[in-house]
Regions:
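Surface-exposed amphipathic alpha-helical tracts and adjacent flexible/coil segments at the periphery
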Residues: 1-25, 30-40, 50, 54-55, ...
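Short active-site loop/helix that positions an aromatic residue
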Residues: 104-109
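Short, glycine/polar-rich helix-capping loops at beta-to-alpha or helix-loop-helix junctions
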Residues: 122-126
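Ser/Thr-centric signal marking residues that sit
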Residues: 116-117, 121
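Short, conserved active-site loop motifs that form the nucleotide-linked donor/cofactor pocket
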Residues: 94
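An active-site metal/cofactor-coordinating segment within enzyme catalytic domains
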Residues: 43-47
Length: 608
């Protein structure tokens, strides 16, 4: 028997209701959004009422709504979390993205749970454990390569694997970063990351010699895996996740539309894959991720350690490379290159000291740029466009609603007429009305077809309409309009009542974890989490860093390696011309020692 096509999900971020709607209208199959509390982005919380409105719209198209509760929970918050989860379940949320395993022992409804990347999901053993615990969709660690993803899929074929494809990168393995808590009392595991990794540092050796001065040595480029989607599909990824719950609407529209196009191109060639939702989206611009915020792009270890992934010069957006400065005059700059700027664009460059400088372009005349204020730029400097005025206008105007394609048939009955509608998701409605059947004096078929096709400001658009009788009856336009409106309401009601959510199975008996002890990186912050792990056979459980900070332990665990970025990778035979240990020093004098575990290809950051 032929296998059914694999349903593939494009998962887009949303900081609020409006952004979520924009994501859906630009091609998302699912959206993830923050709850009022307990999400990994404190600045991106939303009311339950807004989430309820979102689910009603999303479910029309089979789009799923995931809510992020991906932080660790304290004991005095458990009752609030239980109450919030019940509210979210009651308004139709499809799943929660969670970090704290204590949630599995809470008194909550059977809402589906997904394992956040904050759980540090990078081994088949970990994924299998979570899957057996009832978390059917697992967000993989960003650092995993194609071969590792393939191996996990083969080992745990039932688990739905979710992987990031685009957006900002955390330098530490997610869930294992304690730098923000240590330095600023703001826990990344509590949704309050202070972005320690985007700071500027000096790199000094054991003798105090400055190796690198004032660089963003932990700041990474942004992920862009758009060229590798097919390989990821074949490795077993079924959910493609865009990072960015703090990003503005234009970013989400642009990146979502771009990945929608790329995936649809693959589906057209590969019928074994299909999108998981329904509806036509028509962005009113040509998507281009290079035109939205980015620090430069990397596929981030997807095919091993090759290209450098760091963005040492700046943690800010570079945008798209446009050309090289050919000449600097008193009040304008001449640029060589095939790309063109426009009035109102933002431009930037890296100066001789390695710092990012920017300026606004007031006027463009051919290859001449007239800045609002002349920057200190020299001949030969590469220019980037980090704000495209024209593109941003196009994206902001793009508001075309999503539509379900609809096939209609209009038939004659014994005592009237019937209108049947079936949309692309398979939802069907039929209405019969009694009506006098008088023959028309003039041909009516063209007018009837036009009346039947007028679905206007509804979620439907007619792509096929058939009038299945030969007689030319006079049918009042008001009757056709009433039938059309009634059938529309019937379709909408069926979408509301027939939508089926996946529900979580009860926690199984006899679930065991191979580890017998867990250190602070397990992030156990409440009694329920401790009880969960104890029930799985764990005997020694350390408290979370946020509760009892252990001394002299790594604050970060990174696959990014500063020695590799600087050309001193010992695994490739290179020698470092400075004495170890190396340390990072921030502007206020605080120091952080670097530990290099070359066998595991990992760099650790430890406070001195």
């Amino acid at each position: 028997m032929k296998n059914s096509p694999v349903k593939i999900e494009l998962l887009a971020p949303a900081r609020d209701y409006e952004t979520a709607i924009d994501a859906i209208n630009h091609g998302a199959d699912a959206v993830y959004i923050g709850a009022p509390r307990f999400g990994a982005r404190q600045a991106a919380g939303n009311s339950v009422e807004d989430i309820a409105r979102l689910t009603e719209y999303a479910h029309l198209f089979g789009v799923k709504v995931y809510v992020t509760l991906n932080t660790i929970v304290y004991d005095d918050e458990i009752a609030d979390v239980e109450s919030l989860i019940a509210e979210l379940y009651n308004v139709g949320v499809d799943a929660l993205i969670v970090q704290d395993m204590g949630i599995l022992r809470m008194n909550i409804p059977p809402i589906a749970l997904h394992a956040s990347t904050q759980m540090d999901n990078r081994t088949a053993e970990k994924v299998d454990f979570l899957y057996r615990a009832g978390l059917k969709q697992i967000v993989l660690a960003r650092e995993l390569g194609i071969e590792e993803i393939t191996a996990i899929h083969k080992a745990v074929p039932g688990a739905r694997l979710e992987a990031f494809v685009h957006g900002a990168l955390c330098v530490s393995y997610s869930g294992r970063c304690y730098a923000s808590q240590h330095c600023f009392a703001r826990s990344a595991n509590r949704g309050a990351c202070a972005q320690f990794c985007r700071l500027a540092f000096d790199l000094v050796d054991a003798d105090g010699k400055v190796v690198v001065r004032d660089k963003h040595l932990l700041s990474l480029k942004d992920m862009n895996r758009s060229a590798a989607l097919e390989q990821m599909l074949d490795a077993g990824v079924v959910s493609f996740k865009i990072e960015g719950r703090l990003k503005e609407n234009s970013y989400v529209k642009n990146v979502t539309a771009y990945y929608r196009n790329r995936l649809d191109e693959i589906f057209a060639r590969r019928p074994e894959y299909v999108r998981s939702s329904h509806g036509v989206t028509r962005p009113q611009f040509v998507p281009s991720p290079a035109k939205s915020f980015n620090r430069g792009f990397t596929n981030y270890f997807l095919f091993g350690r090759g290209e450098d992934i760091a963005s040492f010069d700046t943690p800010k957006s570079l945008g798209e490379q446009m050309g090289e400065v050919k000449m600097v005059m008193k009040n304008y700059i001449v640029v060589a290159g095939g790309s063109t700027f426009a009035n109102g664009d933002g431009a930037c460059f890296i100066d001789d000291d390695g710092h990012l400088q920017g300026f606004r372009i007031n006027r463009v005349e051919g290859d001449r740029l007239f800045p609002q204020t002349m920057p200190e730029v020299v001949k030969g400097t590469l220019l980037y466009r980090n704000f495209s005025n024209e593109f941003e206008r196009e994206v902001s105007r793009s508001s075309s609603p999503r539509k379900l394609r609809l096939a209609l048939s209009f038939t004659s009955t014994v005592d009237g007429f019937a209108l049947t509608a079936i949309d692309e998701s398979g939802v069907e409605a039929m209405l019969e009305v009694q009506s006098e059947k008088a023959l028309a004096r003039t041909p009516q078929r063209v007018n009837l077809l036009g009346q039947l096709s007028k679905w206007g400001n509804t979620p439907f658009e007619v792509t096929d309409v058939k009038v299945l009788f030969d007689e030319d009856y006079f049918i009042p336009s008001s009757l056709v309009a009433d039938m059309r409106r009634s059938v529309c309401e019937m379709l909408l009601e069926k979408h509301r009542t027939e939508y089926v959510r996946e529900e979580r199975s009860p926690l199984p008996d006899g679930l065991l974890l191979s580890e017998k002890s867990l250190d602070y990186t397990a992030n156990v912050a409440n009694l329920l989490s401790r009880e969960f792990y104890a029930s799985c056979g764990v005997q020694d459980i350390s408290p979370a860093f946020e509760l009892t900070p252990p001394a002299d332990v790594p604050l970060m665990y990174c696959k990014h390696c500063i020695k590799y970025s600087l050309g001193w990778c010992s695994r490739s035979g290179a020698r470092m011309p400075f004495k170890e240990p190396l340390s990072l020093v921030v502007g206020d004098g605080r120091r952080f020692r670097l530990q290099f575990d070359c066998k595991k290809c990992m760099m650790k950051v430890v406070a001195e």
